[in-house]
Amino acid sequence: MDENKQKALAAALGQIEKQFGKGSIMRLGDNRAMDVETISTGSLSLDIALGAGGLPMGRIVEVYGPESSGKTTLTLELIAAAQREGKTCAFIDAEHALDPVYAKKLGVDIDALLVSQPDTGEQALEICDALARSGAIDVMVVDSVAALTPKAEIEGEMGDSHMGLQARMLSQAMRKLTGNLKQSNCMCIFIKQIRMKIGVMFGNPETTTGGNALKFYASVRLDIRRTGAIKEGDEVVGNETRIKVVKNKIAAPFKEANTQIMYGQGFNREGELVDLGVKHKLVEKAGAWYSYNGDKIGQGKANACNYLREHTEVAQTIDKKLREMLLSPAVAEGPEAGEMPEKKEEEF
């Protein structure tokens, strides 16, 4: 670039920063803050599938799946992980179905969690926007998009037609929210339900509610599915769960995480450590016995998991080594690396 152009560019940049504030325009390579801060999801497998060690701050995230697939559990696990890092979280309960007892069992500090149960969709989204603009909230969860009912629909008659009303409301909200979330470095997670498109002969008939705006504005989209039941004898004690990263703007997409959600406990972290440890040769398996560093830790997976629950320092070491192996060095050294929360041994 010639000297006159450089002077003109410097003057323009100076004017823009003077008018709109420092950092309103920058060279991409100069800005260290472009490294995206993340929060662990509570599942090591999912953190690895996301490629960044967790979900990104300052972005919109969409979580969708069938009923009882673990969508709310995933967000509550993330809230618990964020609270352990000293972050402030809010839960916009549009479905009016949040169970504080279950949230507490997953490790959520319910005394510190901000909860809103809005009357209309517009009210819920205005609350989200106000919290984002405050700069004091780190994580927000909206459960769920399907329950964000426009005011006109609530005040109208039961049979009235409101074509595209919710989609227009969400599209406008996304335009307002995106910039405010980035400026305040606040993550907003929207939980979505699945619907079936009528008359689809070929291809996938599934779609999500609320139009297409959220799909475009979301930096990460997660598809969570229940793939089987975990039984102890005849009693079902949890779900086998598959989480697919459908969209990812911070790392490579289309990766999958297979994990277990135990009723009343959340993600089976110790089970993930055993499975991933064996896969990547950190944990040795000989017959039914599992060993780590030459020491036997249990006969059968259940006993190995119990050992890791009782010896949290061993679990933390395996967790840290797996993150160092499977994530980039900068990501693996994050605050969530190696932290294994204590589980409450309660029946759900």
Curated annotation (Swiss-Prot):
Subcellular location: Cytoplasm
SMART domains: AAA
Broad class of where this protein is predominantly found: cytoplasm
PROSITE patterns, alphabetized: RECA_1, RECA_2, RECA_3
MF terms (GO), sorted A to Z: ATP binding; ATP hydrolysis activity; ATP-dependent DNA damage sensor activity; damaged DNA binding; single-stranded DNA binding
Keyword Nucleotide-binding set for record: yes
Any one biological process term the GO annotation gives: DNA repair
Superkingdom of the source species: Bacteria
Keywords in alphabetical order: ATP-binding, Cytoplasm, DNA damage, DNA recombination, DNA repair, DNA-binding, Nucleotide-binding, SOS response
Chain sites annotated for binding ATP: G65, P66, E67, S68, S69, G70, K71, T72
GO cellular component: cytosol
Function per UniProt: Can catalyze the hydrolysis of ATP in the presence of single-stranded DNA, the ATP-dependent uptake of single-stranded DNA by duplex DNA, and the ATP-dependent hybridization of homologous single-stranded DNAs. It interacts with LexA causing its activation and leading to its autocatalytic cleavage.
NCBIfam families given in the database record: tigrfam_recA
Classification via HAMAP family: RecA
Protein family: Belongs to the RecA family.
Name of the protein this chain belongs to: Protein RecA
Annotated organism of origin: Vibrio natriegens
Record gene name: recA
